[in-house]
Amino acid sequence: MSVALFCGPPPAVSFGCKDGRGRKGMVRSKDIVRQTVKPPAHACRLIGWNKYPGSVVPTNSSLSPSPTALDDEIELDLSPFLIIYKDGRIERLKGTTVIPACPEVATKDVIIDPATGVSVRLYLPNVVDLPSKKLPVLVYFHGGGFVIENTGSPNYHNYLTLLAAKSGLLIVSVNYRLAPEHPIPASFDDCMAGFNWVVSHSAGPAPEPWLARHGDLTQILISGDSAGGTVTHYVLLRADAGVIEGAALVHPYFLGSKRLENQTEEDFEFHEKLWRLSTPDTEGLDDPLINPLAPGAPSLAGLKCKRAVVFVAELDFLVERGRMYYDALVKSGWGGEAELVHQKGVGHVFHLSDYSGDVSVDMMAKMVAFLRGE
């Protein structure tokens, strides 16, 4: 097990989505990973949407492009997330850096499904003083639009290290497969598998000693931000009754076919394009996987938890969808306790890159209080 010290937030990066300006002013991350994996056929068909400025690099048919020029031809541009080139490369522009598992709390990675490569990263707070104490368990699903990020991303690793230290919970972060190489529902299936893997430790031999020795499996909570919030809802509908104590949905990535007043046309079209790339068999933005309030979607009365909190941010493209979800949950006849936390002056997942600001500190305090049941 590798050991390191939690060093605070990563260097600030200018991402428009974090300050309410959409994608304006975006800069590319320096940590670019080029993957020589041919994307699925559906990803290439999306080039028909050539109404987005800059999404395709035109070529001169009268010239024979050099290998270098061909390498740079773009099939589909989904900045600031990823770019797909005509030669099959996928270039992820952010969310690719991986830092080793490390404690201030103890951390380690465990592969839970060798066939798919799905793994989890565990965060165990200091239990030296109380070695026999059982800790509530939080299963966490990271965000990234289903196409970027991982459990080793600096933002997520640092945030969950801090959350484990402050809350005293044993955290299990699920590293699911990403689209477009692994189209949805792969990510949903992987997260459900990660959740079930944790639950399995309550019945019979436990393969993971940290969970067996230190996890209170009568106190399981789940949470996720952005796309991870979408997955959290998915798991809540499919878990066995009585297993999940509470759920925290942070800036959940819920969409819909109707553009809301706070959503620009540019952002709306971008996220529709991203969803169709990730989910080739989708019927659109009213797919119940991404729109829990769509006609035919399962009733929110069926959520399998006792308590739920929904965090929304004033400058977030998704703020109204989050509020609508909360309102629908309250009116659904669901028998649990629901809470809405609306934070002003901040944008989407601001808390992952700013730990010291007043709003971030307040959000952490509210999250810790919820997880502890205070």
Swiss-Prot record:
Transit peptide stretch: 1-68
Please give the tissue specificity annotation from the record for this chain: Highly expressed in pistil and bulb scales. Lower expression in stem, and barely detected in root, leaf, petal and stamen.
Q: Does the keyword Transit peptide apply?
A: yes
What does the record give as EC number?
A: 4.2.99.22
One GO term in the molecular function aspect is: hydrolase activity
Broad enzyme group: lyase
> Any idea which residues are catalytic in this one?
226, 316, 348
**Main location class:** plastid
Keyword Lyase part of the UniProt annotation: yes
An annotated GO cellular component of this protein is: amyloplast
Q: Where in the cell is it found?
A: Plastid, Amyloplast
Q: Which GO terms describe its biological process?
A: defense response
Its keywords, alphabetically, are: Amyloplast, Lyase, Plant defense, Plastid, Transit peptide
State the Pfam families in the record. Abhydrolase_3 (PF07859)
- Superkingdom of this protein's organism: Eukaryota
Q: Which family is this sequence assigned to?
A: Belongs to the AB hydrolase superfamily.
Q: How does it assemble?
A: Homodimer.
Q: What does this protein do?
A: Lactone-forming carboxylesterases, specifically catalyzing intramolecular transesterification, but not hydrolysis. Involved in the biosynthesis of tulipalins, defensive chemicals that show antimicrobial activities against a broad range of strains of bacteria and fungi. Substrates are 6-tuliposide A > 6-tuliposide B.
Its UniProt miscellaneous note says: 6-tuliposide A and tuliposide A-converting enzyme, which are compartmentalized in the vacuoles and plastids respectively, come into contact with each other for the enzyme reaction releasing toxic tulipalin A upon cell disruption by pathogen infection or herbivore predation.
Indicate what this protein is called per its UniProt record. Tuliposide A-converting enzyme b2, amyloplastic
Task: Give the originating organism.
Answer: Tulipa gesneriana (Garden tulip)
